[in-house]
């Protein structure tokens, strides 16, 4: 028996980092994806030929991991298997259309895909809510800090608004279009999250005020998306980027790209996701794509998808 889970990757439109501290956020799934394939084997074996530059191979029976990057990715897989008490040995193959740690939610996708595929292989029928909750708890366990935004967005799919307070979500029916690409990051999302936590502890009042403004922007952005008022929405993207800059989340290259976008008259542009480089999104235009390519950004297929994780028995 072989089970394959296909997980859409995601872009964060508004509220990244603020969502960790119970402010609202908006994210959407895109046409880039990650697949997790689970098949019968006599021992636990994890293979990821595309998720890292050199590829990864791990024998859990011997517990030998040579790559630091592999440790980060495969820790998620191990925790999923451990959650299900490693009931049956399997081979797990992970393939992604993009490289990891670029702000597109590949870490969450690894977890969601493994939870969905391995549970189905074991004959356990989980609801989407159960997949999302299990995945979020595992991400939180591994990283120490995490919001539910990535795991829930990739489980359910579509453009999703997460209200303040960390409970519930709302899917928004829209044909919103973006131009998106990614540049190299200087640190992982987990590392950026801890940097932001340090800032919070040293400047709590200022930090909370900035997050409150980001929350107000996110709520206004939700209304503008529904109204399809992309002119004002684009202005809020620039403001949101500036606030993320004030939190130390952006990078010099990303700031330069966003500044240049504004000079060129591109309607809206900001970083998306963890920061420190990574993904950059703009209101869809030819000019935005030309700009991103001029900085050697890898353009991603940012077409909005309505489906979350799906699985098939092969």
Curated annotation (Swiss-Prot):
The enzyme's E.C. designation: 2.7.1.36
Keywords, ordered alphabetically: ATP-binding, Cytoplasm, Isoprene biosynthesis, Kinase, Lipid biosynthesis, Lipid metabolism, Magnesium, Nucleotide-binding, Transferase
HAMAP family: Mevalonate_kinase
Binding site for ATP: 103-109
InterPro entries xrefs: GHMP_kinase_C_dom (IPR013750), GHMP_kinase_C_sf (IPR036554), GHMP_kinase_N_dom (IPR006204), Mev_gal_kin (IPR006205), Mevalonate_kinase_arc (IPR022937), Ribosomal_Su5_D2-typ_SF (IPR020568), Ribsml_uS5_D2-typ_fold_subgr (IPR014721)
Cofactor(s) needed: Mg(2+)
Annotated compartments: Cytoplasm
Homology family: Belongs to the GHMP kinase family. Mevalonate kinase subfamily.
A GO cellular-component term linked to this record: cytosol
GO BP terms in the entry: isopentenyl diphosphate biosynthetic process, mevalonate pathway
Record-linked Gene3D superfamilies: 3.30.230.10, GHMP kinase, C-terminal domain (3.30.70.890)
Function: Catalyzes the phosphorylation of (R)-mevalonate (MVA) to (R)-mevalonate 5-phosphate (MVAP). Functions in the mevalonate (MVA) pathway leading to isopentenyl diphosphate (IPP), a key precursor for the biosynthesis of isoprenoid compounds such as archaeal membrane lipids.
Catalytic activity entry: (R)-mevalonate + ATP = (R)-5-phosphomevalonate + ADP + H(+)
Name this polypeptide is given: Mevalonate kinase
Leader sequence segment: none
Catalytic EC class: transferase
NCBIfam families reported in the protein's UniProt record: mevalon_kin
Pathway(s) per entry: Isoprenoid biosynthesis; isopentenyl diphosphate biosynthesis via mevalonate pathway; isopentenyl diphosphate from (R)-mevalonate: step 1/3
Molecular function terms, GO-annotated: ATP binding; magnesium ion binding; mevalonate kinase activity
Quaternary structure note: Homodimer.
Organism of derivation: Saccharolobus solfataricus (strain ATCC 35092 / DSM 1617 / JCM 11322 / P2)
Active-site residues, as the UniProt record annotates them: 150
């Amino acid at each position: 028996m072989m089970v394959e889970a296909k997980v859409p990757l995601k872009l964060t439109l508004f509220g990244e980092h603020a969502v960790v501290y119970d402010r609202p956020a908006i994210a959407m799934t895109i046409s880039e994806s990650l697949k997790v394939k689970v098949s019968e084997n006599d021992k636990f074996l994890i293979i990821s030929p595309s998720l890292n530059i050199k590829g990864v191979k791990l024998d859990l029976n011997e517990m030998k991991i040579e790559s630091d990057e592999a440790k980060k990715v495969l820790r998620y897989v191990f925790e999923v298997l451990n959650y299900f008490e490693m009931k049956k040995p399997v081979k797990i193959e992970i393939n992604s259309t993009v490289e990891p740690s670029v702000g597109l939610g590949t870490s969450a996708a690894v977890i969601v895909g493994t939870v969905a595929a391995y549970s189905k292989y074991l004959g356990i029928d989980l609801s989407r809510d159960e997949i999302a909750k299990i995945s979020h708890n595992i991400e939180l366990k591994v990283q120490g800090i995490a919001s539910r935004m990535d795991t829930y967005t990739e489980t359910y799919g579509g453009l999703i608004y997460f209200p303040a307070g960390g409970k519930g979500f709302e899917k928004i029916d829209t044909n919103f279009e973006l131009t998106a690409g990614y540049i190299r990051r200087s640190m992982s999302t987990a590392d950026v999250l801890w940097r932001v936590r340090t800032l919070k502890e040293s400047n709590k009042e200022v930090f909370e005020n900035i997050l409150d403004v980001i929350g107000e922007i996110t709520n206004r952005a939700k209304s503008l998306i529904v109204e399809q008022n992309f002119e004002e929405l684009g202005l809020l993207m620039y403001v949101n980027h500036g606030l993320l800059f004030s939190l130390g989340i952006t990078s010099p290259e990303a700031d330069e790209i966003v500044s240049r976008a504004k000079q060129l008259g591109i309607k809206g542009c900001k970083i998306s996701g963890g920061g420190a480089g990574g993904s950059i999104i703009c209101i869809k235009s030819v000019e935005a794509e030309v700009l991103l390519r001029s900085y050697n950004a890898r353009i991603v297929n940012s077409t909005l998808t309505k489906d979350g994780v799906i699985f098939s028995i092969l």
